[in-house]
């Protein structure tokens, strides 16, 4: 299968018109967080972001968009897509029934995040989307292609990650859109707000990272696939 969903039938009037084509079982009126990455491999840090977003933003679903290849990263050490999808499914299952793991970028043929998000929004009218990112990504967000368009396309929630607290709070993207920042105490309103709107969510930090996991496995001579 090319997508994973562990939950009950979604609320609303049924799946959006694009659901059968892209594997995203979403209905109008749902509040949905989108979190993209290579998941090479998926780990507890990814789950931490999902759990925090579900709880603090009041989301109905979190979708992990597993990229065929991150254009900003080397492909040399990237595991095959099917292995990374399996890794993401295994970790998503620990979060709960609100998780969806999708290869939407492969299906849609998009490469850059802004193009992927535009395609998701176009295929799922009526869904309230929020782009999720760790604070480590916010520090370099201004280097992403079309990053200001992302900020204006949907609300953004930044979840604290280890080692990036100071840089992310003073990041160029945070400064550029400072007047659109929503207090964390009002984060539950974010999915219903018109973009640009963003918030920064502090939470107990999880220090797991894909890079550290790959390095540890390489040192032990293990395969990169975290699924036995």
Predicted features, each with a name:
Residues 2-228:
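Nucleotidyltransferase catalytic core that binds NTPs
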């Amino acid at each position: 299968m090319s997508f994973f969903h562990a939950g009950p039938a979604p609320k609303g009037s049924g799946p959006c018109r694009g659901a059968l084509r892209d594997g995203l079982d979403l209905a109008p009126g749902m509040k949905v967080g989108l979190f993209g990455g290579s998941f090479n491999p998926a780990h507890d840090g990814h789950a931490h972001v999902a759990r925090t977003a579900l709880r603090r933003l009041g989301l109905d679903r979190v979708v992990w968009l597993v990229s065929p290849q991150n254009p900003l990263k080397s492909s040399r050490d990237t595991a095959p897509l099917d292995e990374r999808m399996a890794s993401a499914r295994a970790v998503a299952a620990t979060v709960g029934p609100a998780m969806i793991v999708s290869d939407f970028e492969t299906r849609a043929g998009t490469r850059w995040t802004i193009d992927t998000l535009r395609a998701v929004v176009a295929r799922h009218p009526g869904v309230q989307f929020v782009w999720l990112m760790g604070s480590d990504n916010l520090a370099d967000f201004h280097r992403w292609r079309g990053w200001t368009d992302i900020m204006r396309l949907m609300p953004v929630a930044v979840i604290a990650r280890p080692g990036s607290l100071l840089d992310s709070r003073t990041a160029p993207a945070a400064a550029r859109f400072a007047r659109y920042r929503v207090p964390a105490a009002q984060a539950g309103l974010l999915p219903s707000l018109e973009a640009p709107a963003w918030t920064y969510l502090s939470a107990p930090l999880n220090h797991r990272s894909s890079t550290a996991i790959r390095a540890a496995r390489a040192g032990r001579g293990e395969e990169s696939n975290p699924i036995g």
